[in-house]
Every structure is written in C-alpha cells, then in structure tokens.
Amino acid sequence: MNHLEQLVAKWHEYRGYFVRRNVHVGKRIGGGYECELDVVAFHPGLKHLVHIGPSMDANSWNKREERYSKKFGAGRKFIPKLFDGLDVPIDIDQIALFGLGSRANYPKIGGGRVMLMSDLLLDITADLRTKRIEKEAVSEQFPLLRTIQFMCQHEKILAR
C-alpha cells in the first residue's frame, strides 16, 4: 500500500466512510483474481459510494487509460457485492487519484474522473486548518492526518 493510498483511505475513514482496502475481486478458477480494488468507501448518511485508484506512476495517459478502464470496470461489476445487505447507491463515484500529472487534457479516465494529489491536499487542509489541535485534535489512529493538522496550525512558521 502506497502513501497516497493510505492518505486517501484514512481521509475517507476520518469523515465517516466505511472503507475497504486492497480488495481482491473476481476469483479465477485457476487461481488468482481478476482485479484488486485499492480503496472503496461508503458513507451511509450521504449515500455516497466511491472507488479510488491512487497511483504515483509516471506512465503515459494511454497506459493509464488501459489500466483504469480495467480497474473501474471491475469496480462497477463487483463493488455492490462488497456491501451486501447495505443500501448502497447504484452510481459509483470512481476517481483516479494521481500524484503526478495534470488533468488539463485528461479530466476523465477509464470511465472515472481524474483527481490530483494537490486536490486531495486542498480538501484535507481546508477542513483541518479550521480545527485547533487544543480543542479538536485529529485522533492518533490517523497519524498522517494528524501530521497535516499540526502543519496547518503551524503554517506561518513553516512558510519561512
């Protein structure tokens, strides 16, 4: 599991989502699986179901398209079964989360939307910079988020 995968999974968990990580789906008769779903999260209150494929690759967009078409296709096929018994929505918000690249020419990929690490960090810091550590410290079970909260609180010192 890479750093980006940990961060996006913990961010969703922190916000009240039930999160599944590294889920193998489509068991093959001869062994192995059709695909691995990196992060799948469901928020029962918001009725939001999201499938995130984080990557720090520097591959071409053609190669990424091929990879994410397969990954998101498997997600649409198998994700509803992961939350059997829960009232999950039919529509799955599928996000290719990249640490490297630009979405200027590629806002969508493999049937999902492109999100950059900078977008994720903006979302996280917009929320955490409003929460003082003294009153609303992020729980120790979210060390990456807690570190970001500390950085937000001390951003004036860090900006030197």
Residue ranges and their predicted role:
Residues 1-160:
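Intrinsically disordered, low-complexity Ser/Thr/Pro/Gly-rich regulatory segments
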